Amino acid sequence: MNSLEKAVWRSRYLSRKTKVRIFGSLVMPVLLYSCEAWTLTGGLKRRLSTFVCNSLRKIFRIRWQDHVSNQRVLEMAGMSCVTCQIRLRQLRTYGHVLRCPSTDPARRILRAGEPRGWRRPAGRPRKRWLEQLEENLVNVRVTGLAAARTYAERSAEVWKAKVDAAKRLPGACPHT
């Protein structure tokens, strides 16, 4: 990341638009690699958001004294927040997995519960991927996994339209 900062972000020869496009095409795919399988915790959300906003602040040469909000920085870059991008990717992946045959390993993992004889550790249970997915479905205006299953199994186009509509809903992303 330091080499990008020295060679690209500080460059006076590249426009800010070009720098944002480089950020979106080189940094974001690496940052979000396999994010479809993550369970987002509060700490992970904060660290991802901090990294993205700090990088964009370097691109736009915004100092901390300028008092520019993270929302404004994302608007300047024409990006949505990282957690919302991850949520949409997870929803797309869920629809894809539901359309797989029932013998597919990914589909079987979704149906599998806890192994027999296994006990959960003491303390507050960690959030599971399916529990997080149920929360994400609220943003798509789908109530419950059963309703999501019917939409996703109908066709890829129906599910894609439902997920894409979630991007445009007001309040779909509470962070922006």
Across the structure, where does each feature detected by a protein language model lie?
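Short linear motifs embedded in intrinsically disordered, charge-biased segments
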Residues: 1-176
